[in-house]
């Protein structure tokens, strides 16, 4: 594989899938599979760490698949931050572009996600501060690269025993309507403007999700468990009140404006009455996150400086990302072109320097 010393690969069948990986990865054990690939845990004999090896499923099956494969690889390669999942290795058993059909990505093996944590224990306010601080610290970094997560929810937040958190699966979500229909967690954390196509959305769709997650950590229950889009919006407005005229008039969608105007007026509730017993600083922050008007919603950077995080906030240790070139998003290339670009990204991958201080879960 060009300038890299090519390792020795070995083959093994797991769950009716052939895995072909470098010898440094041993003890492969299936941990799950989804639409876009299967994941095994493995021991990385080089670092001594348990890692997650993901084999992408039919990465170049269609133009959409091929572009998504390229997107995932580019995003993961770019992310170098303690609170964001990054890439430890990328490889393919192929020795040339002509034989390049499989892509494998290696990341840290994350133990629990925030869902497990919430179910198991009532969190103290200090726990909530630390967890939400880390989400916002990761988001500041992601947003500074002009990347929007779009699908932040408890299952996309990995947490280890020390309460250290990493954001997973960002920037990939281009969710279809079917995936958002019905009583689904995917939608419960979604900002109303993205769920209902109100208008062009911005980075703060992720802040809305953080507000929903933070409320859930404080109360132990889902904030807006809507049964469908309409019920979800009703639950949201019971808290936020109906959108002000100034916001409705800025919605490009005629349908959206008509629908909102047809709703009976609802006043905004006093958040202190809803989150009884919560730290007043936490309530104040929630009020700034769960705002219908995206122009008035707090940003990740601003939220980090909120007094609620006084014991964690350190402006010198909340880094931003290098610029991320995503001009490829507007390109319509054929499968072979996306494949060639992906191949180049795989062979040019430089593994991170292991500092011995990485989080194990």
Curated annotation (Swiss-Prot):
Serine/threonine kinase which acts as an essential component of the MAP kinase signal transduction pathway. Mapk14b is one of the four p38 MAPKs which play an important role in the cascades of cellular responses evoked by extracellular stimuli such as pro-inflammatory cytokines or physical stress leading to direct activation of transcription factors. Accordingly, p38 MAPKs phosphorylate a broad range of proteins and it has been estimated that they may have approximately 200 to 300 substrates each. The gene is mapk14b. It is found in: Cytoplasm; Nucleus. A motif (TXY) lies at residues 181-183. GO terms for cellular component: cytoplasm; nucleus. Its main location: cytoplasm. The TXY motif contains the threonine and tyrosine residues whose phosphorylation activates the MAP kinases. Predominantly expressed in the ovary. Lower levels present in brain, gill, heart, spleen, kidney, muscle and gut. This is Mitogen-activated protein kinase 14B. Its EC number is 2.7.11.24. Gene3D superfamilies: Phosphorylase Kinase, domain 1, Transferase(Phosphotransferase) domain 1. Keywords: ATP-binding, Cytoplasm, Kinase, Nucleotide-binding, Nucleus, Phosphoprotein, Serine/threonine-protein kinase, Stress response, Transcription, Transcription regulation, Transferase. It is an enzyme of class 2 (transferase). InterPro entries: Kinase-like_dom_sf (IPR011009), MAP_kinase (IPR050117), MAP_kinase_CS (IPR003527), MAPK_p38-like (IPR008352), Prot_kinase_dom (IPR000719), Protein_kinase_ATP_BS (IPR017441). Activated by threonine and tyrosine phosphorylation by the dual specificity kinase, MKK6.
């Amino acid at each position: 594989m060009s300038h890299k010393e090519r390792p020795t690969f070995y083959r093994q069948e797991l769950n009716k899938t052939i895995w072909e990986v470098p010898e440094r990865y041993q003890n492969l054990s299936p941990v799950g599979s989804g639409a876009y690939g299967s994941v095994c845990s493995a021991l990385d004999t080089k670092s001594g760490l348990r890692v997650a090896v993901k084999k992408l499923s039919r990465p170049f099956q269609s133009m959409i698949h091929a572009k998504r494969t390229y997107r995932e690889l580019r995003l993961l390669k770019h992310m170098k931050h303690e609170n964001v999942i990054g890439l430890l290795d990328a490889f393919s058993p192929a020795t040339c572009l002509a034989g390049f059909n499989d892509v494998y990505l290696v990341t840290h093996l994350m133990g629990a996600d925030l869902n497990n944590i919430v179910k198991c224990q009532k969190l103290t306010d200090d726990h909530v501060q630390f967890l939400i601080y880390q989400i916002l610290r990761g988001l500041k970094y992601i947003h500074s690269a002009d990347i929007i997560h779009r699908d932040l929810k408890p299952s996309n937040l990995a947490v280890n025993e020390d309460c250290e958190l990493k954001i997973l699966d960002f920037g990939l979500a281009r969710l279809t309507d079917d995936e958002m229909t019905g009583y689904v967690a995917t939608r419960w954390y979604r900002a109303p403007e993205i769920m209902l196509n109100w208008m062009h959305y911005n980075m703060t769709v992720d802040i809305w999700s953080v507000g929903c997650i933070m409320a859930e950590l404080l109360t132990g229950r889902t904030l807006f468990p809507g049964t469908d889009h309409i019920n979800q919006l009703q639950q949201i407005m019971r808290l936020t009140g109906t959108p002000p005229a100034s916001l409705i008039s800025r919605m490009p969608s005629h349908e959206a404006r008509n629908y909102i105007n047809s709703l009976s007026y609802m006043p905004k509730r006093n958040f202190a009455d809803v989150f009884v017993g919560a730290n007043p600083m936490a309530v104040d922050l929630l009020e700034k996150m769960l705002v219908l008007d995206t122009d008035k919603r707090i940003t990740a950077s601003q939220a980090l400086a909120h007094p609620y995080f006084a014991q964690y906030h350190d402006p010198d240790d909340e880094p931003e990302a290098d610029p991320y070139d995503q001009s490829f998003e507007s390109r319509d290339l054929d499968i072979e072109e996306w494949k060639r670009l992906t191949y180049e990204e795989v062979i040019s991958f430089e593994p991170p320097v292991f500092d011995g201080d990485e989080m194990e879960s």
